[in-house]
Amino acid sequence: MPGPVTSRKALAYAVAAIVALTAIIAWRSASAKKATAEQDVHPVPVNLNATLTNEMSDTSSLDGFDKMVKNYLTYWAINGASLSVMRNDSLLFAKGYGIADTDKEMQPGYILRMASVSKLVTAVGIMVLRDRGLLTLRDKVFGPDGILCDSIYNAAIKDTLYYRITVEDLLRHKGGFSKRGGDPMFSTRWIMMQNGWTEVPTQERLMELQLKRRLRFVPGTAQEYSNFGYLALSMVIEKLSGTDYETFMQENVLRPAGCVDFHIAGNYYKHKLPNETRYYVQHDDEPADEFNNSGRKVTRCYGGNNVTGLSGAGAWAASTPELALLVASIDGKPEVPDIITRESVDLMTEYFDESTYSLGWNDTKDSYWTRTGTFAGTSALIKYFPDGECWIFISNTSTYKGPGLAHHTAELFDKLRAKYSSKLPARQMFYPEPQEDEESQSDEKNWFEF
């Protein structure tokens, strides 16, 4: 039989175990309450594209608003468009106008190609890598010490100025690339003909071809808008993440922001996603040579360019509500949690001068953040205003104005804001309305109000 000392030790061990177990239970309970409280502060967004409908933004106080938008589409012969309005990270309005496809009304849940607005998405991906310590904006991109240091690329470089190109240079269109002789991202057919290629060049082959060319200016000393520079950034993301560009962006940028329906667009109507719109050009637009040098003539928005091959320079498709949610996730406001650090937000939106692009944004002068995108079948505009409102418009039709249409869309935004900003419903459509039982109901404002 155990002695008295042994019995006392056993009793002490038992008491200690009970105390420890009680502490663990209390800690877990407190942690659970804390987690629940945090979830209450920042609710999880719903699948916006499967939830939002035009009827949710129908109100008699905005009848004149709808008329102005419809008149705008009629004037520019635009078949359909999506418009979303956000204020201080709250989605107030989301509506489709015109048609999404034959006999299909445009709804806010339809996704549309966004052209160069894709560059903003890519820039966010770069900033996510920066926040994780995987790169700095000063990192060199090419050469033996660069990120894209593959031997095949190093062997292709003839102009040593390539060794000076930094990640920031690419983000600001200061890499030294030139579109003289054609933009390589929109000259696939000519590139195939000039090089005797029978297959559409991969991004790796395009990169090798570009690196054989001389740069137009010393990197960082001037700027020239470059789609190729953002293809290079897409490849930087792939190299550092070890996965393909679309997958990395969806898993590490878009889904953390609550955006579940962003996709790299296809080239042809047969490749469109179930909730993607049809694209249109003007009725007098001449058929184009197919980008793959097949010898066929095609509608310019379906095969005239290698849209998929644009990757992070212009290939994304999304709805305007989800695009608004992404902007809310990178704007530094607390209402929707940001997916990048405050420092990265400031870096992206810092304004220098008219000859310096912002990071991903076209321009951020006086806190007016602007991002545009245009190619056959698409015109897109994001306009973020100093008062916290953000207006996003994407059409499924291109016009003879080309990139110039964005200027007229911005004028439409100004007119609508002047007349109807105060009449927009005060609500939060990014998140579902919370369900309360009778005991918890009160007259106080809920989190979805402001």
Region annotations inferred by a language model:
Residues P2-K95, Q250, N292-F450:
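Catalytic loop of the DD-peptidase/beta-lactamase superfamily, centered on the K-T-G motif
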Residues S61, F65, M114, S118, ...:
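Hydrophobic (often cysteine-bearing) scaffold residues that line and stabilize catalytic clefts
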Residues S61, F65, Y110, Y163, ...:
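Residue-level signature of the cytosolic catalytic core of signaling kinases
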Residues V69, L83, D89, K119-T122, ...:
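Residue-level preference for non-acidic, small/hydrophobic
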Residues T74-S82, D103-D169, F217-F228, S311-G314, ...:
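Short active-site loop at a secondary-structure junction
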Residues G98-I99:
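Solvent-exposed serine/threonine-rich low-complexity stretches and specific carbohydrate-binding patches
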Residues A155-Y368:
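Short, surface-exposed loop or secondary-structure junction motifs
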